[in-house]
Amino acid sequence: MEHNKVDTEPQDSYDDQQKWVLDSSTDSRGEIPLRAQTGAWRAALFIIGIEFSERLSYFGISTNLVVYLTTILHQDLKMAVKNTNYWSGVTTLMPLLGGFVADAYLGRYGTVLLATTIYLMGLILLTLSWFIPGLKACHEDMCVEPRKAHEIAFFIAIYLISIGTGGHKPSLESFGADQFEDGHPEERKMKMSYFNWWNAGLCAGILTAVTVIVYIEDRIGWGVASIILTIVMATSFFIFRIGKPFYRYRAPSGSPLTPMLQVFVAAIAKRNLPCPSDSSLLHELTNEEYTKGRLLSSSKNLKFLDKAAVIEDRNENTKAEKQSPWRLATVTKVEEVKLLINMIPIWFFTLAFGVCATQSSTLFIKQAIIMDRHITGTSFIVPPASLFSLIALSIIITVTIYEKLLVPLLRRATGNERGISILQRIGVGMVFSLFAMIIAALIEKKRLDYAKEHHMNKTMTLSAIWLAPQFLVLGVADAFTLVGLQEYFYDQVPDSMRSLGIAFYLSVLGAASFVNNLLITVSDHLAEEISGKGWFGKDLNSSRLDRFYWMLAALTAANICCFVIVAMRYTYKTVQPSLAVVADGGDDVETATGTNNTSKFT
């Protein structure tokens, strides 16, 4: 009888794993979620839906922002590009604050609600700036200088949208990923697809923004476009709230900075103690005692920090668990600090890619403005920002081919369930960004030569179709690197910091926007010092964007070499198995397997 009880225990554990979600998440009532009623794609679709509307609004504004600044606010090229980069930089750095608030205090769902409300406030103010008489851009339809009140209202509105995006982006994407349990084999595979399809939905929003919304802004009016964006965001917010019973929630875990500081203090305090060669002698909780995420295995890098987990006196009656966390840390806490330190070089060497990516919404669009955008045989003129749709289409096509064709083939060839490692995917995209800059330099040189041949005649311009290759190739780069960065930072950060993980990925683009401004200023100044003429004039025909693109290509090539070296030395995190159950065939199956802890870049 006892023998039968032992035999059934593994099966009972397996049945519980299939019925319940055992990853410390809760349902809308605060209870352990039922797998069949919560999470997975039934919840993720609501989340992807509101992301569609957020990207619709963001790109409806950002891709046409340089046009707005030069035509409505009458700023010159350099000032318009810099203001666009400043706004983009702030917008993509704000998620660091939003992710911190989500992980530490409000939770991801609560942060999404607050951020979306602020986002809507920005959209409403943007709409009012076009319809309230005192806030309108001009007294008449034609004016040389816009009202100061309109300019102030406009910038307040778009920076409110920045704040909203700061809470929305990291919380929503990580909240969507939380709907898939890492410890469940089927849901873990779904999560790998989730990031690809998240970006497909995101690109659908971008595609609609740069075609429909941009056309409305150019041909009907910015005010009408703002009304549409506000209505779409409000509607999707309402639908997102309807999905509340289907979501899985994670409670905020408090400030992540305190445990990190505790590890450093403990390691310094015990710097003179020997570190045991056997990592099992270091202090760690059991799976049953640890309720906030998963336990991590000890790694061989940054061994100095392991001293924080050294137990000073094993003969003491006081249990190690009751010692001050400022004196004794767990292996998991130590490894979480190591993870964040190891991410710094990866983050830094992806900035060059971010600089290349920022060109698509600034200089690429400005090029399109002065080129022939007529559709052959018709009088229809394509709005310049609509060329950004080529990037969205390229991402959708590339992600689909990668997910449906390349991953199955690569999975069989490499044995990696992702097909290739995350860092390999990022590296491939960086190579495509290099190609995009080379193509952009060649096309811009051709455009300048064409303009000189026709004596800068504004009626004789090169067709904008020549810009298609640089947009398309940059889209392929985004499909590999941006999606890879999302997955990398979400997967490799500590479980309690996953909103911040998404913020780290976005901060690459934010920091790159400021780096781009610095490069514009420095390169323009140096060119003027050397040759007497800068690379950025009042308009494109008096500028030398081709040389700027060549400079970016050279920097990207050097950066790729550095990235490969860092990636080859990178150590992925390893998660301890939390439960072993018996599968149908009788083999042991780990329900929380860790990523291989050796670099898989090569």
UniProtKB/Swiss-Prot annotation:
Keywords: Membrane, Phosphoprotein, Transmembrane, Transmembrane helix, Transport
Keyword Iron: no
Chief location of this protein within or outside the cell: membrane
Compartment(s) of residence: Membrane
The keyword Lipid metabolism belongs to this UniProt entry's keyword annotation: no
Transmembrane segments: 56-73, 87-107, 112-132, 152-172, 197-217, 220-240, 337-357, 381-401, 422-442, 465-485, 500-520, 548-568
Phosphothreonine, modified sites: 111
UniProt xrefs under Pfam families: PTR2 (PF00854)
Membrane topology category: Multi-pass membrane protein
Any one GO molecular-function label of the UniProt entry: dipeptide transmembrane transporter activity
Origin superkingdom: Eukaryota
Example of a GO cellular component annotation carried by this entry: membrane
Entry's family note: Belongs to the major facilitator superfamily. Proton-dependent oligopeptide transporter (POT/PTR) (TC 2.A.17) family.
PANTHER family according to UniProt: OLIGOPEPTIDE TRANSPORTER-RELATED (PTHR11654)
Name the UniProt record assigns to this protein: Protein NRT1/ PTR FAMILY 5.7
